[in-house]
Amino acid sequence: MKILLTGFDPFGGEPINPAQEAVERVNNNINGAEIIKITIPTVMTKSVEAIDKTIQEHNPDIVISVGQAGGRFDITPERVAINIDDFRIKDNEGNQVIDTIIKEDGEPAYFSKLPVKAMVKHMNENKIPASVSNTAGTFVCNHVMYGILYMIDKKYPNIRGGFIHIPYTTSQVIDKKNTPFMSLEEIVKGLELAIEACIIYKEDVKEIGGEIS
């Protein structure tokens, strides 16, 4: 089995991106699966193009993209991506699209092809805080998640794919009072556990994971 794991480069004025840092530190082999790791640019079109190129080169069974969501308390596998770009800030090439459809021939939304509740369960059972997220935002993270699932829908039907958001890491919150964070070591462990769950569970578990609002 091959698993493609991607992390973004720094964006939004941050000197590092814990997604990139954590992905680089994930084990190269997990439960017998080869982990292929790449850094993708925080740029709307080029990010998805880089993933597509790597899929064609390596033919992975699973694609997992990882991004930072500063302000979140835990690791959050994303349930759904929506067909809209609405950038609050510019991406790393100055693009700031507003209320723009990502793919005219795509679905209004795509649900993750990963066992998101099983991933959360496996992380929590191993003392890593995690929960299911029902919004990947409207920036490049959602764009990438939607792009992965669009490609699965249109040309890679045998691949499973999805997205995981992670919090700030320790060094990023020194000047951000009362901001949640997680150590890089915990993030790496969480990602490895999430990958394990994707290998173990072909279908998701039935457990409470919803939100009131």
Swiss-Prot record:
Q: Indicate the residues that form the catalytic site.
A: E78, C141, H165
Q: Which Pfam families match?
A: Peptidase_C15 (PF01470)
Q: Which reaction does it catalyse?
A: Release of an N-terminal pyroglutamyl group from a polypeptide, the second amino acid generally not being Pro
A single GO molecular function term of this UniProt record? pyroglutamyl-peptidase activity
Q: Which GO terms describe its cellular component?
A: cytosol
What family does this belong to? Belongs to the peptidase C15 family.
- What's the protein called, per UniProt? Pyrrolidone-carboxylate peptidase
